[in-house]
Amino acid sequence: MFEKTNRMNLLFDFYQELLTTKQKAYVSFYYLDDYSLGEIAEEFEVSRQAIYDNIKRTEESLEKYEEKLGMLKKYQQREKLFSQLEAQLTKKNFLDEQVKDTLEQLKNID
């Protein structure tokens, strides 16, 4: 469950602008704020089943966006390469503060 929550949070970060206002709210409450389905249903005055169905559809949408656009996959690949580069530079004593700052800037472009 923890892995799924992390994945959904990351997908939400990348693709939330493609979701409806309602989808954003439900997913945000459920995954980011850790509300239960019942708490969200009470907040929006709808049934628990309606919240569940909407969240499941939204999860499917987020996965489809990732399948087509691959933003999360590319992000994870870049992070892995940055870590490898940092380790290689450290090993060869080439990692000074200026290089560290440049690597950080590259990481934060997205």
Curated annotation (Swiss-Prot):
Gene3D superfamilies, A to Z: Winged helix-like DNA-binding domain superfamily/Winged helix DNA-binding domain
Pfam families per UniProt: UPF0122
Top-level taxon of the source organism: Bacteria
Function statement: Might take part in the signal recognition particle (SRP) pathway. This is inferred from the conservation of its genetic proximity to ftsY/ffh. May be a regulatory protein.
Family statement: Belongs to the UPF0122 family.
NCBIfam families named among the record's database cross-references: PRK00118.1-4, PRK00118.1-5, PRK00118.1-6, YlxM
This protein's name: UPF0122 protein Lm4b_01818
Organism encoding this protein: Listeria monocytogenes serotype 4b (strain CLIP80459)
Lineage of origin: Bacteria, Bacillati, Bacillota, Bacilli, Bacillales
